[in-house]
Regions:
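Long, basic/Gly/Ser/Thr-rich N-terminal segments
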Residues: 1-91
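Glycine-rich phosphate-binding loop of nucleotide-binding enzymes
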Residues: 102-189, 506
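Substrate-engagement module of ASCE P-loop NTPases
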Residues: 147-151, 439-445, 477-495
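Loop/turn-to-beta-strand initiation segments
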Residues: 158-162, 413-416, 452-456, 490-495
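P-loop NTPase motor domains
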Residues: 168-172, 203-479
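Conserved AAA+ ATPase "SRH/arginine-finger" region at the nucleotide-binding site
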Residues: 187-192, 202-206, 515-524
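Conserved ATP-driven motor cores of ASCE-family P-loop NTPases powering translocation/secretion/packaging/pilus
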Residues: 218, 475, 482-486, 490-544
């Protein structure tokens, strides 16, 4: 069938067709160029005179290796691939083995299944790419079903797979998993109207500076100190400690002293002091606070009066009152962080954080900081506040146990968790995925025994969440980039399912080792696929 080599150009080889027949059944079949090396090519076209193939790899030491290092010579023996070599391409046919994952049936080689080694596929970050309608969701569901439903020898009881489901379509695929011994499935939803005890919830007191920066859409690193101060204050104010009231007075006093020393005109100073005290006050410092002198008492408001010479004659009394309360050191107030607080509590802390940081004296600084407070207020009174409404305290370790076990049996671990994000907008879903992923990653990094609690985070419509965004500029890192670079050694693996790889974070995608590529059309996406590996050729791109 195969004659001499007529031409070799890049990865394409043209071979003389000795049969002088065109047989379409040979298209897609592999051939071997046998000499010192066993080069593998796939037949791409046939004419009466020539057969064209594309080199895709080599057989070395009983394994198939993608990529081309060598080229065939004129002395190469050319033949069709044999059965043993087909197995090296399509994978083991021992599907009952716990080491092998059934993927599907070969369209080229009748009677052969396609499989992958379980550990090789799921021990590295992976991506499943394909246009809308190409079968990505079906592919994911089928792969996971094959792990749990078609595996009778060794069930993966230690698996923890979290599916961030953009459309709520995976629930029916895994709802019967609990019928298998020692297996369990759990379902969370963002559907507030229908959820019972399975509504997506993140305790407000879990939110750290970077989480709040994302939630409040901070766009400048200078906004972070306000968030840090609010997180300090919320525990002090919520604790009901006697020092909490004292510290509130301290914050107000220091802010008012700054205004008094600003050098502004007395009328401006008076108006600003009254404005602050109207909104921020305590029983010790307010406009009606009595300032007593021998034989004469006045309210603080009266002490702010301006005489006919444009001066504030009683200002020294105001300074003495404020100085008496401006003595509290925040760092010396020790409060246990073992109680819950709400977004409403955090909002009150933001109020005092604004004046504590002195932003009232700068219009620009105030606008920048006040934006965060306004956004927090919008979340509290909007449709997203309910997802942070947890009124009881739990540690993050307790949260993880609660998240990954059945509510009726905390000894029963759930191997698949489906998170239905179909009822929230893309921006909020992106924030939730980042916060959850950070919680998972931090939990894994703090385990005494590294990688003892493996977690697979699978992101449907990953291009909505894993983007080249501004996280690095604002908070210093992107959680998905961090997980792709560091997560594997802690047992945290990311899986991206997307129709737009060109919109994914380049850092995250570059760390993926395994790819399943379905039908793709968009030129920018095809360029990304080709750049993923030197093993992807132009001919491979044409085939998808």
């Amino acid at each position: 069938m195969f004659g001499k080599i007529l031409d070799v150009h890049d990865y394409n080889v043209k071979i003389e067709n000795l049969t002088k027949r065109v047989e379409s059944s040979y298209l897609g079949v592999h051939i071997v160029f046998e000499e010192k090396f066993y080069l593998v090519g796939v037949i791409t076209s046939m004419t009466l005179d020539a057969i064209e193939c594309t080199l895709i790899g080599e057989f070395t030491n009983g394994k198939f290796n993608n990529g081309i290092i060598h080229k065939p010579s004129s002395s190469s023996l050319i033949r069709l691939i044999n059965k043993e070599e087909v197995l090296l391409l399509v994978g083991s046919q021992e599907l009952d083995s716990k080491d092998n994952l059934y993927i599907g049936k070969s369209l080229v080689y009748d009677g052969f299944n396609v499989s992958a080694r379980m550990n090789d596929l799921f021990s590295n970050h992976f991506a499943i790419l394909g246009n809308t309608g190409s079968g990505k969701s079906c592919c994911v569901a089928r792969l996971l079903q094959n792990i749990f439903y078609n595996n009778e020898t060794a069930m993966p009881t230690n698996a923890h797979i979290v599916l961030f489901d953009a459309f709520g379509e995976y629930n029916t695929a895994f709802e019967n998993l609990g019928q298998i011994p020692n297996m369990a499935f759990k379902y969370y939803t963002t559907d507030v109207k229908r959820a019972t005890n399975n509504l997506v919830k993140i305790p407000a007191y879990f939110l750290e500076v970077d989480d709040l920066a994302l939630l409040l859409n901070a766009n400048d690193p200078q906004q972070l100190p306000i968030i840090e101060k609010a997180l300090q204050l919320v525990y002090i104010f919520k604790s009901q400690d006697a020092k909490a009231l004292q510290y509130k007075s301290d914050i107000i006093a220091k802010s008012l002293l700054d205004i008094l020393s600003s050098g502004k005109q007395p009328t401006q100073v008076r108006d600003q002091l009254i404005a602050v005290l109207t909104n921020y006050n305590t029983p010790d410092i307010n406009l009606d606070t009595i300032i007593a002198q021998p034989g004469y008492s006045r309210t603080l408001r009266q002490c702010l009066n301006i005489d006919n010479q444009g001066k504030m004659p009683a200002v020294s009394l105001v300074v003495d009152l404020l100085s008496a309360h401006a003595k509290t050191d925040l760092d010396k107030i020790e409060v246990e962080h073992n109680f819950a607080y709400s977004l409403e509590d955090l909002y009150q802390a933001f109020e005092f954080a604004l004046i504590s940081e002195g932003v009232l004296s700068s219009e620009k600084a105030f606008d920048m900081a006040n934006t965060l407070k306004v956004r927090l207020h919008s979340i509290i009174n909007g449709e997203h506040g309910v997802y942070f409404d947890v009124d009881h305290f739990m540690t993050k370790e307790e949260f993880m146990i609660d998240f990954f076990t059945l509510p009726e049996n905390r000894q029963r671990t759930c191997q698949i968790i489906n998170m239905n994000f179909a009822y929230v907008d893309d921006r909020f879903a992106k924030i939730l995925t980042k916060i959850y992923s950070k919680i998972f990653f931090n939990f894994a990094t703090n385990l005494k025994r590294r990688a003892s609690f493996p977690i697979h985070i699978v992101l449907e419509e990953a291009h909505r969440y894993v983007q080249n965004d501004t996280d690095v500029e604002i908070i210093g890192y992107n959680i998905f980039d961090r997980i792709t670079k560091e997560g594997r050694k802690y047992g945290v693996i990311l899986g991206f399912i997307t129709q737009r790889p060109s919109e994914l974070s380049k850092t995250a995608l570059s760390q993926c080792s395994n790819f399943i590529v379905l039908r793709m059309y968009y030129p920018d996406d095809l360029i990304i696929i080709k750049s993923m590996s030197a093993k992807v050729t132009d001919e491979s791109i044409e085939r998808i």
